[in-house]
Amino acid sequence: MSFAEKITGLLARPNQQDPIGPEQPWYLKYGSRLLGIVAAFFAILFGLWNVFSIITLSVSCLVAGIIQMVAGFVVMLLEALCCFVCFEQVNVIADKVDSKPLYFRAGLYIAMAIPPIILCFGLASLFGSGLIFGTGVVYGMMALGKKASAEDMRAAAQQTFGGNTPAQTNDRAGIVNNAQPFSFTGAVGTDSNV
Protein backbone atom coordinates (compact mmCIF):
# COMPACT_ATOMS: atom_id res chain seq x y z
CA MET A 1 0.00 0.00 0.00
CA SER A 2 1.47 3.33 -1.05
CA PHE A 3 1.65 6.45 1.08
CA ALA A 4 -1.08 8.13 -0.97
CA GLU A 5 -3.43 5.18 -0.47
CA LYS A 6 -2.82 5.28 3.28
CA ILE A 7 -3.62 9.00 3.42
CA THR A 8 -6.77 8.61 1.33
CA GLY A 9 -7.85 5.68 3.49
CA LEU A 10 -7.48 7.79 6.62
CA LEU A 11 -9.43 10.73 5.21
CA ALA A 12 -12.18 8.73 3.49
CA ARG A 13 -15.50 8.35 5.20
CA PRO A 14 -16.99 4.91 5.78
CA ASN A 15 -19.07 3.71 2.80
CA GLN A 16 -18.22 6.85 0.89
CA GLN A 17 -19.27 6.81 -2.77
CA ASP A 18 -16.87 9.51 -4.00
CA PRO A 19 -19.22 12.52 -3.65
CA ILE A 20 -16.85 14.98 -5.27
CA GLY A 21 -16.53 13.01 -8.46
CA PRO A 22 -13.81 11.21 -10.33
CA GLU A 23 -12.69 14.30 -12.25
CA GLN A 24 -10.97 15.80 -9.21
CA PRO A 25 -7.43 14.68 -8.39
CA TRP A 26 -7.03 12.74 -5.17
CA TYR A 27 -4.72 15.33 -3.64
CA LEU A 28 -7.33 18.06 -4.14
CA LYS A 29 -10.18 15.97 -2.72
CA TYR A 30 -8.37 14.83 0.37
CA GLY A 31 -6.24 17.94 0.68
CA SER A 32 -9.36 20.07 0.97
CA ARG A 33 -10.71 17.75 3.65
CA LEU A 34 -7.39 17.86 5.54
CA LEU A 35 -7.28 21.65 5.24
CA GLY A 36 -10.83 21.78 6.61
CA ILE A 37 -9.90 19.64 9.61
CA VAL A 38 -6.83 21.75 10.39
CA ALA A 39 -8.84 24.95 9.84
CA ALA A 40 -11.56 23.76 12.20
CA PHE A 41 -9.04 22.90 14.91
CA PHE A 42 -7.34 26.30 14.71
CA ALA A 43 -10.67 28.13 14.47
CA ILE A 44 -11.83 26.50 17.69
CA LEU A 45 -8.50 27.18 19.39
CA PHE A 46 -8.27 30.83 18.34
CA GLY A 47 -12.00 31.32 18.92
CA LEU A 48 -11.39 30.30 22.51
CA TRP A 49 -8.56 32.84 22.62
CA ASN A 50 -10.97 35.53 21.41
CA VAL A 51 -13.51 34.49 24.05
CA PHE A 52 -10.88 35.14 26.73
CA SER A 53 -10.72 38.72 25.47
CA ILE A 54 -13.70 39.43 27.72
CA ILE A 55 -11.01 40.23 30.28
CA THR A 56 -10.34 43.43 28.32
CA LEU A 57 -14.11 44.10 28.17
CA SER A 58 -14.25 43.64 24.41
CA VAL A 59 -17.73 42.32 23.77
CA SER A 60 -17.34 42.30 19.99
CA CYS A 61 -14.30 40.02 20.31
CA LEU A 62 -16.30 37.77 22.64
CA VAL A 63 -19.07 37.46 20.06
CA ALA A 64 -16.52 36.96 17.28
CA GLY A 65 -14.84 34.21 19.29
CA ILE A 66 -18.14 32.42 19.85
CA ILE A 67 -19.03 32.65 16.16
CA GLN A 68 -15.55 31.43 15.23
CA MET A 69 -15.82 28.44 17.57
CA VAL A 70 -19.25 27.54 16.18
CA ALA A 71 -17.87 27.82 12.65
CA GLY A 72 -14.98 25.56 13.65
CA PHE A 73 -17.37 22.98 15.06
CA VAL A 74 -19.51 23.08 11.91
CA VAL A 75 -16.48 22.60 9.67
CA MET A 76 -15.24 19.78 11.90
CA LEU A 77 -18.69 18.21 11.78
CA LEU A 78 -18.75 18.27 7.97
CA GLU A 79 -15.13 17.27 7.39
CA ALA A 80 -14.29 14.83 10.20
CA LEU A 81 -17.26 12.74 11.25
CA CYS A 82 -15.03 10.57 13.41
CA CYS A 83 -14.87 13.38 15.98
CA PHE A 84 -18.63 13.25 16.55
CA VAL A 85 -19.41 9.52 16.64
CA CYS A 86 -21.44 9.87 19.84
CA PHE A 87 -24.10 11.99 18.13
CA GLU A 88 -26.60 10.09 15.99
CA GLN A 89 -27.78 12.95 13.77
CA VAL A 90 -24.31 13.96 12.60
CA ASN A 91 -24.32 11.41 9.77
CA VAL A 92 -27.66 12.69 8.50
CA ILE A 93 -26.46 16.29 8.45
CA ALA A 94 -23.14 15.42 6.80
CA ASP A 95 -24.86 13.28 4.14
CA LYS A 96 -27.31 16.09 3.42
CA VAL A 97 -24.47 18.58 2.90
CA ASP A 98 -22.49 16.04 0.85
CA SER A 99 -25.46 15.64 -1.49
CA LYS A 100 -25.39 19.38 -2.26
CA PRO A 101 -23.10 20.79 -4.97
CA LEU A 102 -19.61 21.84 -3.95
CA TYR A 103 -20.33 25.54 -4.38
CA PHE A 104 -22.85 25.24 -1.53
CA ARG A 105 -20.13 24.05 0.84
CA ALA A 106 -17.75 26.72 -0.48
CA GLY A 107 -20.31 29.47 0.12
CA LEU A 108 -21.13 28.12 3.57
CA TYR A 109 -17.49 28.10 4.66
CA ILE A 110 -16.79 31.55 3.24
CA ALA A 111 -19.92 33.01 4.83
CA MET A 112 -19.04 31.52 8.22
CA ALA A 113 -15.48 32.85 8.08
CA ILE A 114 -16.22 36.52 7.40
CA PRO A 115 -18.17 37.73 10.53
CA PRO A 116 -15.45 36.97 13.12
CA ILE A 117 -12.88 38.86 11.06
CA ILE A 118 -15.21 41.86 10.76
CA LEU A 119 -16.19 41.88 14.45
CA CYS A 120 -12.72 41.48 15.93
CA PHE A 121 -9.87 42.08 13.52
CA GLY A 122 -6.77 40.52 14.99
CA LEU A 123 -4.32 37.72 14.39
CA ALA A 124 -6.44 35.14 16.20
CA SER A 125 -9.60 35.79 14.21
CA LEU A 126 -7.69 36.40 10.99
CA PHE A 127 -5.75 33.14 11.18
CA GLY A 128 -8.58 30.94 12.52
CA SER A 129 -11.28 32.21 10.20
CA GLY A 130 -8.80 32.73 7.37
CA LEU A 131 -8.12 29.00 7.24
CA ILE A 132 -11.85 28.31 7.02
CA PHE A 133 -12.07 30.94 4.28
CA GLY A 134 -9.20 29.21 2.46
CA THR A 135 -11.03 25.89 2.71
CA GLY A 136 -14.08 27.53 1.17
CA VAL A 137 -11.94 28.91 -1.65
CA VAL A 138 -10.51 25.44 -2.35
CA TYR A 139 -14.01 23.96 -2.48
CA GLY A 140 -15.06 26.81 -4.77
CA MET A 141 -12.20 26.03 -7.12
CA MET A 142 -13.22 22.39 -7.09
CA ALA A 143 -16.78 23.42 -7.91
CA LEU A 144 -15.55 25.34 -10.95
CA GLY A 145 -13.89 22.19 -12.24
CA LYS A 146 -10.75 21.69 -14.18
CA LYS A 147 -9.75 23.71 -17.18
CA ALA A 148 -10.58 22.37 -20.62
CA SER A 149 -7.88 20.86 -22.78
CA ALA A 150 -5.97 23.07 -25.21
CA GLU A 151 -7.72 21.47 -28.19
CA ASP A 152 -11.17 22.16 -26.73
CA MET A 153 -10.29 25.80 -26.02
CA ARG A 154 -8.90 26.28 -29.55
CA ALA A 155 -12.04 24.74 -31.05
CA ALA A 156 -14.27 26.99 -28.95
CA ALA A 157 -12.26 30.06 -29.95
CA GLN A 158 -12.49 29.26 -33.67
CA GLN A 159 -16.22 28.63 -33.77
CA THR A 160 -18.36 31.02 -35.77
CA PHE A 161 -21.66 32.12 -34.29
CA GLY A 162 -24.71 32.74 -36.47
CA GLY A 163 -22.87 32.77 -39.77
CA ASN A 164 -20.42 35.51 -38.76
CA THR A 165 -17.10 35.52 -40.48
CA PRO A 166 -14.21 34.21 -38.41
CA ALA A 167 -12.14 36.77 -36.58
CA GLN A 168 -9.29 38.34 -38.50
CA THR A 169 -5.92 37.79 -36.97
CA ASN A 170 -3.63 40.00 -39.05
CA ASP A 171 -2.09 43.25 -37.85
CA ARG A 172 -4.22 45.42 -40.14
CA ALA A 173 -7.53 44.14 -38.76
CA GLY A 174 -9.47 46.94 -37.10
CA ILE A 175 -12.69 47.34 -35.24
CA VAL A 176 -14.08 49.83 -37.74
CA ASN A 177 -13.89 49.25 -41.48
CA ASN A 178 -11.97 51.88 -43.45
CA ALA A 179 -10.32 53.26 -40.32
CA GLN A 180 -7.24 55.35 -40.99
CA PRO A 181 -4.07 54.43 -39.09
CA PHE A 182 -2.53 56.81 -36.61
CA SER A 183 0.36 58.79 -37.96
CA PHE A 184 2.94 60.80 -36.15
CA THR A 185 4.34 63.54 -38.36
CA GLY A 186 7.20 64.57 -36.20
CA ALA A 187 8.46 65.22 -32.75
CA VAL A 188 6.13 66.72 -30.23
CA GLY A 189 6.67 70.45 -29.74
CA THR A 190 8.62 71.47 -26.71
CA ASP A 191 7.07 72.86 -23.63
CA SER A 192 7.56 76.46 -22.48
CA ASN A 193 9.71 75.10 -19.63
CA VAL A 194 7.41 76.47 -16.99
From Swiss-Prot:
Positions of transmembrane segments: 35-55, 66-88, 107-127
Localisation per UniProt entry: Cell membrane; Cytoplasmic vesicle, Secretory vesicle, Synaptic vesicle membrane; Presynaptic cell membrane; Endosome
Signal peptide bounds: none
GO biological process, one term: clathrin-dependent synaptic vesicle endocytosis
Main subcellular localisation: membrane
Description of activity control: Channel activity is inhibited by La(3+), which reduces Ca(2+) influx and thus inhibits it's function in promoting activity-dependent bulk endocytosis (ADBE) in response to high stimuli.
Protein topology in the membrane: Multi-pass membrane protein
GO molecular function (one): identical protein binding
Residues with site note (Calcium ion selectivity): 79
Keywords: Calcium, Calcium channel, Calcium transport, Cell membrane, Cell projection, Cytoplasmic vesicle, Endocytosis, Endosome, Ion channel, Ion transport, Membrane, Synapse, Transmembrane, Transmembrane helix, Transport
Pfam families registered for this protein in UniProt: Cg6151-P
GO terms for cellular component: cell projection; endosome; presynaptic membrane; synaptic vesicle membrane
InterPro entries per UniProt: TVP18/Ca-channel_flower
Keyword Plastid: no
Membership in a protein family: Belongs to the calcium channel flower family.
Complex formation: Homomultimer. Associates with the dally/ magu complex.
Function statement: Transmembrane protein which mediates synaptic endocytosis, fitness-based cell culling, neuronal culling, morphogen gradient scaling, and calcium transport. Regulates synaptic endocytosis and hence couples exo- with endocytosis. Controls two major modes of synaptic vesicle (SV) endocytosis in the synaptic boutons of neuromuscular junctions (NMJs); Ca(2+) channel-independent Clathrin-mediated endocytosis (CME) in response to mild stimulation, and Ca(2+) channel-dependent activity-dependent bulk endocytosis (ADBE) in response to strong stimulation.
The protein's name: Calcium channel flower
Organism: Drosophila sechellia (Fruit fly)
Lineage: Eukaryota, Metazoa, Ecdysozoa, Arthropoda, Hexapoda
Recorded name of the encoding gene: flower
